[in-house]
Amino acid sequence: MITRTLVLLATVATVAGAQSAPSATSQIRTNWKDMMANVTAAAEEVPDAIYAYKPTPEVRSFGAIMAHVAGSQRMFCAMALGDAPTAEDDIEKSATTKAAIVAALKASNDYCERAYAQSDAANAAMVDVFGTQRSRLFALMMNATHDAEHYGNVVTYMRLNRMVPPSSRPRP
């Protein structure tokens, strides 16, 4: 009887302590949301005059980087949703003011929310990513990685203009 009770208690404790692992998509979504919170905060906070700033003539301006992020997000998330992707540089060519760029960035975030809300099963489906069959999850990982790459540019541009980037500020 004692053995049965101990086995039962051990089983209950194991089941009670077990937690299901978060899905791959939800983990990538968390990473993407954190990154885009910083990118969007920077886009909103940087003054209009700095949107034209380029540290050297051959690189994108701050505004062009933000527009590029908005456009590329739209492209990657379209791939992940199975929609026809737009050209990566559509927004970069059409949005030229801070207001238009911030609006495009927020719209691309909203669009991407749908892609990151898909299940792991849905994100296992294969789609065309630059001419190669990859999973929808791969397209979402590419998006999050690409956003992080350009947030590095944003941090540098802000520092060169004596601004503190969102990710370097004390947390509340």
Regions found by a protein language model. Name each.
Residues 1-2:
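N-terminal secretory signal peptides that target proteins for export/translocation
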Residues 5-14:
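Sec-dependent N-terminal signal peptides
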Residues 16-20:
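Boundary at the C-terminal end of the N-terminal hydrophobic targeting segment
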Residues 29-33, 37-40, 48-90, 128-172:
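Short, contiguous alpha-helical
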Residues 42, 93-128, 134-146, 150:
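Acidic/histidine-rich alpha-helical segments that form the ligand environment
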